[in-house]
Amino acid sequence: MSITTEEKARVMKEYGTKDGDTGSPEVQVAILSSRIATLTEHFKTHKKDNHGRRGLLKLVAQRRKLLDYLKAKDEARYQSLIERLGLRR
């Protein structure tokens, strides 16, 4: 499952530091969070989709790595992002 181009553009505008920002950790984590939420909804109706579940776990691991990187580089930005996305940690 992927997110629409409009959804991705909205996330980039909301979490980006400047116009066209696609590479900052905040934007990457926000896009991954959106994809994870979409897949989570998918698995509520498709419980036996184990191949897709593996992809979900890879996305969660990638998001975790990016969050760890951001925490090591700038604790304040990390805390701000966690609060804005509503992630627990």
UniProtKB/Swiss-Prot annotation:
This protein's superkingdom? Bacteria
Keyword Transmembrane helix: yes or no?
A: no
Pfam families from the entry?
Ribosomal_S15
Q: Which GO terms describe its cellular component?
A: cytosolic small ribosomal subunit
Q: Ranges of Basic and acidic residues compositional bias?
A: 1-21
- List UniProt keywords, sorted A-Z: Ribonucleoprotein, Ribosomal protein, RNA-binding, rRNA-binding
Any stretches that span the bilayer, and where are they? none
Positions of region (Disordered): 1-24
Which BP terms from GO are recorded? translation
* Keyword Ribosomal protein assigned: yes
Which CDD domains does the entry link to? Ribosomal_S15p_S13e
Q: Which GO terms describe its molecular function?
A: rRNA binding; structural constituent of ribosome
Q: How does it assemble?
A: Part of the 30S ribosomal subunit. Forms a bridge to the 50S subunit in the 70S ribosome, contacting the 23S rRNA.
Q: Which family does it belong to?
A: Belongs to the universal ribosomal protein uS15 family.
Q: What does this protein do?
A: One of the primary rRNA binding proteins, it binds directly to 16S rRNA where it helps nucleate assembly of the platform of the 30S subunit by binding and bridging several RNA helices of the 16S rRNA. Forms an intersubunit bridge (bridge B4) with the 23S rRNA of the 50S subunit in the ribosome.
Question: What's the name of the protein?
Answer: Small ribosomal subunit protein uS15
The species is: Ruegeria pomeroyi (strain ATCC 700808 / DSM 15171 / DSS-3) (Silicibacter pomeroyi)
